[in-house]
């Protein structure tokens, strides 16, 4: 019996030595955010293939991985053959093109082992017009016209807008966020955050942080109340982005940049992080790459996003 105990102890010790310790996550004030499009990040377009690239991203100095929506995409009114990630059919499932839920969980576990935070894109304003909720939930969960048709905003014919006058919508959206927190994600990048009642974010973020105090929240929006009222850690510095474009074109200059920095600091709480970038998936799609917009100044502008006060750089 003594020999067996010694052997078991030795085996456990060997296993412990062979397992690399999990790397500590960086403080938010030192963090760099990386936007990942799973479909296009690798030739395979899968979680498993993206997982193999995590060591390279770690070497680049990335700290927070923001995954563009990973959920199944609606078929009805789909844009093109692939559809938009932001026309979500099922909030609690993964896009089968990317792999299985187990594949995502493996990706998440490996990312955490390497010290990354992983946040998911949370599209709370709308779903696809053939989403699971459309088929299973009351009609008044959605905004509808006088004929009962779901409402379409802008040219987004591939979505249906949710009705936040219904308490049930608040509860269901908070529930799907909790589902992913229970999976182990570290927070969310919230699409069109100001199109959803700020009070929803306030209530939901507060409730989730009671159980997950380290949850990181990034808002696609620039309203200061996203921080002071709703509890977001970070928000988009859109005005800065447009100013950097203008400076690169010679339309604005450094004094105007300094004035912006001062006014932005006055508008936002002292602990608010501002997401700073020269490009993202919206700008790259509609306004051109940073090199097309900024020319030879693109690299200099990228340096500014890493060095300006309260900034959190996005790659």
Predicted regions and their residues:
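Positively charged n-region of N-terminal signal peptides that target proteins for export
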Residues: 1-4
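Active-site-proximal helices and loops of the catalytic beta/alpha 8
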Residues: 175, 186, 191-274, 304
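C-terminal motif of bacterial Sec signal peptides marking the signal peptidase cleavage site
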Residues: 15-16
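Substrate-binding/active-site clefts of carbohydrate-active enzymes
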Residues: 20-48, 52-63, 69-183, 203-212, ...
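Alpha-helix N-cap and loop-to-helix initiation/capping positions
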Residues: 99, 168, 195-196, 292-293
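Active-site-proximal substrate-binding groove within the catalytic cores of carbohydrate-active enzymes
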Residues: 262-315
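Hydrophobic faces of well-ordered beta-strands that scaffold small-molecule active sites
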Residues: 32-36, 65-67, 118-120, 188, ...
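Sec-dependent N-terminal signal peptides
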Residues: 6-11
């Amino acid at each position: 019996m003594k020999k067996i105990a010694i052997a078991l102890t030795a085996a456990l010790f060997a296993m412990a030595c062979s397992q690399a310790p999990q790397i500590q996550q960086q403080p938010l004030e030192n963090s760099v955010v990386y936007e990942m499009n799973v479909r296009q990040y690798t030739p395979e377009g899968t979680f498993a293939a993206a997982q193999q690239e995590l060591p390279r991203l770690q070497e680049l100095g990335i700290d927070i991985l923001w995954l563009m929506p990973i959920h199944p995409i609606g078929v009805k009114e789909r844009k093109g053959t692939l559809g938009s990630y932001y026309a979500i059919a099922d909030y609690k499932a993964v896009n089968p093109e990317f792999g299985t839920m187990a594949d995502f969980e493996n990706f998440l576990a490996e990312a955490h082992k390497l010290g990354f935070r992983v946040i998911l894109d949370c599209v709370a304003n709308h779903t696809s017009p053939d989403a699971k909720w459309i088929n299973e939930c009351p009609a008044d969960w959605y905004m509808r016209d006088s004929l009962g048709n779901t409402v379409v905003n802008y040219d987004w014919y591939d979505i249906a807008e949710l009705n936040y006058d219904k308490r049930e919508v608040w509860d269901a959206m908070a529930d799907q966020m909790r589902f992913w927190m229970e999976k182990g994600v570290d927070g969310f990048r919230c699409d069109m955050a100001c199109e959803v009642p700020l009070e929803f974010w306030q209530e939901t973020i507060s409730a989730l942080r009671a159980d997950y105090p380290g949850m990181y929240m990034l808002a696609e929006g620039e309203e200061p109340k996203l921080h002071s009222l709703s509890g977001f850690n970070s928000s988009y510095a859109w005005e800065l982005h447009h100013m950097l474009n203008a400076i690169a074109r010679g339309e604005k200059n450094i004094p105007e940049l300094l004035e912006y920095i001062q006014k932005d600091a006055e508008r936002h709480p002292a602990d608010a992080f501002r997401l700073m970038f020269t490009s993202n998936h919206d700008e790259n799609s509609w306004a051109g790459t940073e090199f097309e917009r900024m020319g030879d100044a693109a690299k200099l502008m990228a340096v500014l996003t890493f060095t300006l006060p309260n900034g959190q750089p996005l790659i």
